[in-house]
Amino acid sequence: MRGCGVDRTGGYVRLALAAPAVRVADCAYNTQRMIQTVRRAASCGVDILLFPRLSLTGCSCASLFAQDTLLSAVCTHVSALCAGTADCQLLALVSVPCFLRTQVRVCTALVARGRVLALVVQDTLAACGAQKMQVPCEVLYGGAPVPVYDVQTCFESAEGLFSFCVGAMDGSVPATLVLQAYGTPSTAQTPDIFAAHAAAYSAQHQCAYAYVNAGWGESSADAVYGAESGIFECGQCVVQDSLQEMRERGERPAHAVRGLHVSADVDVSLVHFRRRARSGHTTLGASAPCVTLPAGIFAASKAHATLRRPRVPCPFFPPAFQKSQDAVPPLTGAVCLAVSAPSDTQDGFLQRTIDLAAQGVALRLEHMGCRRLVVGVSGGVDSACALLICARALDFLSIARTQLYALTLPGFGTTSGTKGAAQEFARALGCTVQEISISAAVTHHLHDIGHTMQQCDGTYENAQARERTQILLDRANQLDALMIGTGDASEGALGWETFGGDHLSLYAVNASLPKTVVRALISYAGRVPERFVCETDSPYAPRGAAFSRVCAAIVAQPVSPELIPPCDDRIVQCTEEMLGPYELHDFFLYHITVNGFGPRKLFRVAAHAFGXAYSCAQLCAALRVFFTRLFSQQFKRSCVPDGPGLTEVNLSPRVGFYFPSDTSGALWRAELEQLACGE
């Protein structure tokens, strides 16, 4: 198979699944419904349209499949379908019974631009024997010669941007899209079975997998068909639907007569990236011939203005968090998924995250022979998260939480609100709380190097961060303890940390957790205080509601390093005012490291995911900050302490996303400039 061509589509292929209502053995009626569906799909810019198994006749014709009358009608109406859609720029995959080489076989006709490009033999109808057919070959179909292939054949677009196969392939899968038409009787478990198979197959083979089952109108003599359909991408669901889900959305049964239609934009460039990044993945197989289709078939000659994909502004959260806010629409609608899941689903994910991190800390304590931990707490979400994890780690080892030393280290920018929140949070967990001011030591140090206290610059700020780290490390030495770092993945990606200061620790427990996840963890702790509040009779340890209030206060506090003196005890140094929203930077971080997106594609998917929340100018500004700091601050990530990998993003130079510290970012900056100019 040839390599990827020049991508002018943004890397997306618009795929539609359609299960229009059928009448069993009524080819004329079914053909008209299919023509309507094809024309509607073409008007929406669909590139590939997949129909269910034997959709032109209905899959429940049984012994009638062997009748000359039905087979002749199929051939006639395939020609009618071609004629009725000749001006449509898409590829329709239509499953039909064909009499080939003495057998009635289930074939998929590739219909485009008014003709049948090929027939793909799926299998032989059980009632008619099982004699194997030698392919490839050529047959006369509808009065024209048509090549015939088997399911192990891969078809590629003329531009080489994507490829597909009809039905699951054996062994390695060279195709980027696997298209499966079903005619399977439905049970209550069928949607879950189809979805589980699609998720597993697409994850194993790093491909996109789409399926559609027969639906309304099939014979109900012995079974019913639910039109289950779905598109999965490298293990993740892009969209799912069925007649049952239509009913659950409140659509009247009469709506089912018009059939089910689902469409989405499949990110084939993501599939290509995942395969390149996946060590040992084979995309070529000796038993998988590749056929290049003629040019001009697909509508994907330019990028669509609007993406038909789930809106996922927080990609670090698992698929279980994704729940559609609206009914999955017909071809003319828009697919919109948002982070909104049942609380038990969210809580399970968040609790597992905390417990895995705590396991890492517990194992490191055992390895070092330590029984104490030291954490610097500031009243922000990062240090609160680290403290929460450390408390859990001591529980795992049956060590009293009093062996967890929470040090508040107030300096020139510390406010009473953040210091009070830090101390209250630590006491609720049962920690030993200690306060050590850094003001005198930093003042003396700045005087020694000839730096005035009025000059609140980088030296002024970094001196405080390094003093805090020195105190924490020295206190850990005193206590024979492990000093835990609190910096998160968002700060690591942006280099928003002091080299030799908060950049250093003995174990960086938050290193793979972005700010959005850290905030969610503290909010979760506030929702279930009984899981974390220390069981003690101490009058200083707040219970339940008080702990929840302090968690809420910590989450609501603006992110700040608190290194500049406050105004009337209010924070004046807000990180997100300087860098841009962390939710944007976390979004960029995920997609550049996990999916390999560049600036142009990041801009497009961010605009889609966040809707009207940010203007184009705001997105461009945040992208410029992100890429500038990603490259300029790599030297800090080249020497980081150990820390557990808890998400898909890991910035460790040992096992994660890494590039040399002196790498040029000129290519990415140039693409950003083109983006800013509207090119």
UniProtKB/Swiss-Prot annotation:
Q: Which residues bind deamido-NAD(+)?
A: R364, N462, N477, E491, W496, E497, T498, F499, K636, S661
Q: Which domain of life is it from?
A: Bacteria
Q: Does the keyword Protein biosynthesis apply?
A: no
User: Entry's PROSITE patterns?
Assistant: CN_HYDROLASE (PS50263)
Question: Which residue ranges does the record annotate as region Ligase?
Answer: 346-679
Using the record's annotation, list all stretches that form the CN hydrolase domain. Answer: 13-268
Q: Name one GO molecular function term.
A: NAD+ synthase (glutamine-hydrolyzing) activity
Give the keywords, sorted. ATP-binding, Ligase, NAD, Nucleotide-binding
Give the top-level enzyme category: ligase
State the GO CC annotations: cytoplasm
Pfam families the record matches: NAD_synthase (PF02540)
Q: What is its EC number?
A: 6.3.5.1
Catalytic activity, as annotated: deamido-NAD(+) + L-glutamine + ATP + H2O = L-glutamate + AMP + diphosphate + NAD(+) + H(+)
| SUPFAM superfamilies documented for this protein | Adenine nucleotide alpha hydrolases-like, Carbon-nitrogen hydrolase
Q: Name one GO biological process term.
A: NAD biosynthetic process
- Residues annotated as binding ATP are G376, V377, S378, G379, G380, V381, D382, S383, T486
- Cysteine pairs forming cystine bridges in this chain are none
Record-linked InterPro entries: C-N_Hydrolase, C-N_Hydrolase_sf, Gln-dep_NAD_synthase, NAD+_synth_C, NAD/GMP_synthase, NAD_synthase, Rossmann-like_a/b/a_fold
Protein's pathway: Cofactor biosynthesis; NAD(+) biosynthesis; NAD(+) from deamido-NAD(+) (L-Gln route): step 1/1
Tell me, what does this protein do in biology?
Answer: Catalyzes the ATP-dependent amidation of deamido-NAD to form NAD.
Query: What family classification does the UniProt entry report for this protein?
Result: In the C-terminal section; belongs to the NAD synthetase family.
Spell out the protein name for this chain. Answer: Putative glutamine-dependent NAD(+) synthetase
